[in-house]
Design a protein with these regions (language model features):
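Gly/Thr-rich phosphate-binding beta-strand-loop-beta motif of the actin/hexokinase/Hsp70
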Residues: 1-28, 126-162
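Phosphate/pyrophosphate-binding loops at sites that engage ATP/ADP/AMP, CoA/4′-phosphopantetheine
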Residues: 61-75, 125-130
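Active-site glycine-rich loop that binds ribose-phosphate moieties when present
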Residues: 122-126, 130-131, 164-166, 185-188
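Short beta-strand-loop/turn "lid" adjacent to the catalytic site in phosphate-handling enzymes
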Residues: 66-94
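Short glycine-rich, Thr/Ser-proximal phosphate-binding strand/loop in the N-terminal lobe
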Residues: 12-50, 153-185
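Phosphate/oxyanion-binding active-site loops and adjacent basic polyanion-contact surfaces
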Residues: 52-56, 109-116, 183-186
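Short, well-ordered amphipathic alpha-helical segments that serve as non-catalytic structural scaffolds
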Residues: 54-66, 188
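Active-site neighborhood for divalent-cation/phosphate handling
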Residues: 76, 86, 93-141, 146
Length: 188
């Protein structure tokens, strides 16, 4: 059947996509989203609370059950910046393994950026006729960082990363007691 499920634990929620491959075409056949503030909690506490770990586990188990309804061949669970930055991410990995039997892969910055750029590049290739024949700058603004990638004729030739993202900027503006107008300027 060539069906795969990918679950991403990110700063603003937990996301599931189920993909099916038919020939050379890969199609998303289902999606699910659970919104929760993981990144903000880690930014403030440097760890995940017991309740947040419990919530993440319950959502992962629920998404696994939904994916099994499609008879998926494999379920991949990965964590991004918020999970990587949590001091107790190893405990979360253990709990997910115990409760759902799934392995949580915590992506490093380079892996996370690579996947983001690949997804962006595929979208740009579809939307811009001669995308692979030009020089392009892709800026990826995440909740924990801002990344830049230079693409030359379809090949990624340079990457750099700044450790400040939307959550950090929001936290700074809160600490400075900025008005809404000034806060939006800082975050923009």
């Amino acid at each position: 059947k060539d069906i795969l499920c990918v679950i991403s634990i990110a700063s603003h929620g937990i996301y599931m996509e189920i993909f099916q491959k038919k020939g050379n075409i890969i199609k998303i056949i289902d999606k699910a989203v659970h919104i929760t503030q993981i990144g903000k909690e880690v930014l403030l506490n440097h760890k995940l609370t017991f309740n947040k770990i419990k919530e993440i586990n319950e959502v992962i188990k629920s998404m696994k059950t939904a994916a099994e309804g499609y008879q998926v061949e494999k379920i991949i669970v990965f964590g991004t910046t918020a999970i990587r930055e949590a001091k107790n991410s190893d405990y979360l990995q253990d709990q997910i393994k115990i409760t759902s039997g799934l392995d949580l892969i915590i992506l490093d910055k380079l892996e996370e950026n690579y996947l983001a750029y690949e997804k962006i590049s595929v979208a740009l290739e579809k939307g811009i006729k001669d995308y692979n024949e030009k020089n392009n700058l892709i800026i990826y603004i995440g909740s924990g960082n801002v990344s830049f990638s230079v693409i030359n004729n379809g090949i990624n030739i340079y990457n750099t990363n700044i450790e400040i993202g939307s959550l950090v900027l929001s936290d700074i503006s809160n600490k400075l007691n900025l008005s809404d107008k000034k806060r939006n300027i800082v975050i923009d």
